Every structure is written in structure tokens, then in C-alpha cells.
Amino acid sequence: MPVIESAIQRVRLTKKQHDRNEPQLSAYRTAVKKFEKAAAAGTDNLAELYKAASSAIDHAYSKGLIKKNKASREKSRLAKYVK
């Protein structure tokens, strides 16, 4: 356990940030996996799932969970399947 007060505060803050970020990251990953699974199966609602995955990627980027280039790369990679 940290002894210095600023270190104690950082531990508290890090836990708070983790508790906030983890569900958002999970939702982003789940949306992408759902789309990839549907694309592999060849289902017909790919456009709808792409929209949800793209929205989840944008949300993760706007919250600072992923970087701009990763967001663009993910969306581009998923867009190949929609055509």
C-alpha cells in the first residue's frame, strides 16, 4: 500500500477511472466482435451491425480509450465487409 498521500490519491483515482473505462471498452469490443461474427456467417443485417460497431468505435475514441489512428483503422477494416 502506498504511504505518501499523493500516491494514495492516485490509487483512488486510477480505480475510479478503471471502473469507468472498463465497461465502455467492453461495449466497444463486443460491438466489433458481433459485427465480425455476423460478417463471417454472412448474415444480411451487416449494415445495421456496422453502424453500431462504428458508433461504438467513435464513442471509445471520443472518451480517449483508443487513439485516432486505431479508430480509423478499425472502421476501415470493418467497412470492407459491408460492400
Curated annotation (Swiss-Prot):
SUPFAM superfamilies: Ribosomal protein S20
GO CC annotations, alphabetized: cytosol; small ribosomal subunit
Molecular functions (GO terms): small ribosomal subunit rRNA binding; structural constituent of ribosome
Keywords associated with the record: Ribonucleoprotein, Ribosomal protein, RNA-binding, rRNA-binding
BP terms from Gene Ontology: translation
The keyword Lipoprotein is assigned to this record: no
Stated family: Belongs to the bacterial ribosomal protein bS20 family.
Function as written in the Swiss-Prot or TrEMBL entry: Binds directly to 16S ribosomal RNA.
Protein name stated in the entry: Small ribosomal subunit protein bS20
